[in-house]
Amino acid sequence: MPDTAAPTPDRPGPDDPGRGRRLGVDVGTVRIGISSSDPDGILATPVETVSRDAKEDSDFRRIAELVEEMSVVEVVVGLPRNLREGTGSSARDAAGFARELGERIAPVPVRLVDERFTTTTAQRSLREAGVRSRQQRGIIDQAAAVAILQDWLEQRRRCGSEGDTP
């Protein structure tokens, strides 16, 4: 029986893994945008776009490879929500993706973060940078993943979860 509980975003807290590289993930129906942070958690940058692959699971395998290659301490997956704090099928899909990814990369934690407006913000930023709509298709998912991860990094700073403790 499918899980019908509405997924909710996580918040940085006492279970923060501390200093280390993080991945941001923007889950779409066709593509997945991936970003990473520097080890100090200051800046998110684009990494790549991965095609969704329900049959072969190459999307999960590629993200797991990145987690290992980059020594990632935490993965942040965008949770699409509407203006009324509600969730729909996209949010359930992202939450299911995050849950399965978490099982595959354990013990690395996978968090959900509110991603309202990230794609819109990414489109605007790319447009302002002179990137045409047609050219955005290949990088918009990465730009959204950057926005998702950067928001998480800023939440961590506001909560004092930088992991600077010895």
From Swiss-Prot:
A Gene Ontology biological process in which this protein takes part is: rRNA 5'-end processing
Q: Per the annotation, which location comes first and is thus the protein's main one?
A: cytoplasm
The reply on keyword Hydrolase is yes
Question: GO cellular-component terms in the record?
Answer: cytosol
The molecule here is called Putative pre-16S rRNA nuclease
Cellular localisation = Cytoplasm
Could you tell me the EC number(s) of this protein?
3.1.-.-
> What Pfam families does its record include?
RuvX (PF03652)
Sum up the protein's function in the record's words. Answer: Could be a nuclease involved in processing of the 5'-end of pre-16S rRNA.
What are the GO MF terms of this UniProt record?
Answer: nuclease activity
Q: Give the family from UniProt.
A: Belongs to the YqgF nuclease family.
Listed A to Z, the keywords are:
Cytoplasm, Hydrolase, Nuclease, Ribosome biogenesis
Region: Disordered, residue numbers: 1-24
